[in-house]
């Protein structure tokens, strides 16, 4: 007997006066709560009845709801504190003739995937549901409106958040068994008739999807390059075709959306026995270089960072550096154009989960299983402060570019404790703990100012210093020895930053956070997409850092009581 198909619908609610966010510049009011419908399991998938919590059988990886937002014609550009660059980073793979763009006959016309997802006979796609008035809705909408793409279990939805019927998806794709864990839109190729999206699945397969034409292509099909789940995926800045995907087996791969797949064999035949033996301890093992002349098929490049899961990565605003966080508790800063790891930092304990860059590229913020956020300085290559306020794992962190200027930075974080926290910091606000200051006065040596690496906290012994003074060679394995492994900075010597706002915003873990010009958005494990309107005052004005500057706790014990939190109302009314 056939299993009946159960249709589920999204639900939107408009709480009145519920869950306001009180900050120095005003009150953020909860506009709406869009609850995405969780699709039932595919009929061919056997339900798990009374699972044994002690079972060692691995379960399919899942993620909470993540959003990819895109606006075809935004009214204003996202503000950036990045100074005018005199030197622009070259494109990834620049100098390799095998990656030179091939001129096309169609000129500026965007290439689309070849297969129609609605008429697809692939067993990978279960069914596609399109809105009956999708064409009319697209024609009538403003190009300034916001599109959102969201994953929830085996479903992937295309939403128009500027529509009065925002709860009704333009398209809902149901996959057979695979869950889409991550996705990203290409800002460079977007137009009123074209949007490029890549999404990574729990099966390792990657989908290149163009929603306007409902065309798609399958990349890394059946795990031909890597059969490990895709944990994070992003388009490479400035590229129309190339995107980077992190796999759960510790591999970072660069794919071309228009290249075919082929059975992958690591290109390590030219490496010496000593290099192969040493590769296990090195922070980057190049299985295929972007400089390889073999570029007829995917991947364009493939790197092995560790045997543990890569949780997240983020590109720097100058499009040269890559910050990668792993389940082994490390933050690795790469010059991905040169395929080199520059620095390796460690968490206080536990794995790292999320990472982001400040708009000016000077700071990196990470969050992890130690319930802390950590601010790292890229120019100084050191920790700046630890941020204490979460009661569980930190799942996402993001800067608010509309609240950042040359002196003050605003960022937010969400976690498994169902909380949304907002943070303000400036370098002048941070003070070293008294214990550290006393010991610092006894130092007789002066830190030289003619090097940006003078403030690095690193051991002096040769065994802990991985940076070599010998001349670099072209061998990628040998260049990996240049990475500096920084020791963990004791909590007693690290400034502690409290949040300016802490709020429980739901009853299930929050897993994504985004800032827009007029709102703050979050999404949760069970599919709640919440939107808070910003205060009505002009948000384009320069931020007055005196409006909500918290007192900085830098207790030598590291406990650091966090005071002044707007947390009196932790419930949802």
UniProtKB/Swiss-Prot annotation:
Residues 461-479 have a biased composition (Polar residues). It holds the Pfam family WD40. Keywords: Repeat, Transcription, Transcription regulation, Ubl conjugation pathway, WD repeat. GO terms for biological process: carbon catabolite repression of transcription. Transmembrane segments: none annotated. Residues 448-481, 537-573 are annotated as: Disordered. InterPro entries: WD40/YVTN_repeat-like_dom_sf, WD40_repeat_dom_sf, WD40_rpt, WD_repeat_creC_regulators. WD repeats lie at residues 225-265, 305-346, 347-386, 389-433, 505-542. Belongs to the WD repeat creC family. This is Probable catabolite repression protein creC.
